[in-house]
Each structure stands twice: as C-alpha cells, then as structure tokens.
Amino acid sequence: MEPVDPRLEPWNHPGSQPKTACNKCYCKKCCYHCMCCFTKKGLGISYGRKKRSQRRRPPKSSKDHQDPIPEQPLSRQQPGDQTGQKKQKKALEGKTEADPCD
C-alpha cells in the first residue's frame, strides 16, 4: 500500500472514488458501487424534496355512506331558560306558605 497524504480528507484518498460514474440502475452490483449509491439505492435513503402524495378521492357518482341525523324535538329545558326556573320557584314558595306547621 502506498502511504496516504495526511493532509487529504478521507473522501479524497486515492481509491476512495470509483472509476465509473454512478447510474440509475438498481442491480446488486450498482447498489454497492459506492457509499452514495449504497445509501440511495441499497438503503433507500434520499434527502431530496419529497413529492406530495395525492389523496384518493371517491368517484363523484358514489354517495356518502352516512345518513343525515333526523331532527328531534327538544323535550328538556335549556339551562338558560329563565321562565322555567321562575315557575319552579313560585311553586316551591306556594308549597312552603301553605304549611301551617310553624
């Protein structure tokens, strides 16, 4: 082995770069071509921009599989209903006044 110049970065050492250029082939030989090919092709890691995936939409002719909720009449009193509370207070006052037990 030849002595390596210590001032060179490891990626610039002789023999660190492959003699052939990288290509788009995904065969086993090309996946192990160099470190860059191995990470991109072999491991599937790419740091580029990712495309937006299109959301699958149902065909326009199909209906929603949800039935509308039928309207139901309100049978209970609402918490903000003041007339119902006044009626209840008057009824209670009338009952307490009617007791002659005092």
From Swiss-Prot:
Residues 1-10, 90-102 have a biased composition (Basic and acidic residues). It is found in: Host nucleus, Host nucleolus; Host cytoplasm; Secreted. Residues 38-48 are annotated as: Core. Keywords: Acetylation, Activator, AIDS, Apoptosis, Host cytoplasm, Host nucleus, Host-virus interaction, Inhibition of host innate immune response by virus, Inhibition of host interferon signaling pathway by virus, Interferon antiviral system evasion, Isopeptide bond, Metal-binding, Methylation, Modulation of host chromatin by virus, Modulation of host PP1 activity by virus, Phosphoprotein, RNA-binding, Secreted, Transcription, Transcription regulation, Ubl conjugation, Viral immunoevasion, Zinc. The keyword Iron does not apply. Residues 22-37 are annotated as: Cysteine-rich. InterPro entries: IV_Tat, Tat_dom_sf. Residues 49-87 are annotated as: Interaction with the host capping enzyme RNGTT. GO terms for cellular component: extracellular region; host cell cytoplasm; host cell nucleolus. Its main location: host cell. Belongs to the lentiviruses Tat family. The cell attachment site mediates the interaction with ITGAV/ITGB3 and ITGA5/ITGB1 integrins, leading to vascular cell migration and invasion. This interaction also provides endothelial cells with the adhesion signal they require to grow in response to mitogens. The Cys-rich region may bind 2 zinc ions. This region is involved in binding to KAT5. This is Protein Tat. It comes from Human immunodeficiency virus type 1 group N (isolate YBF106).
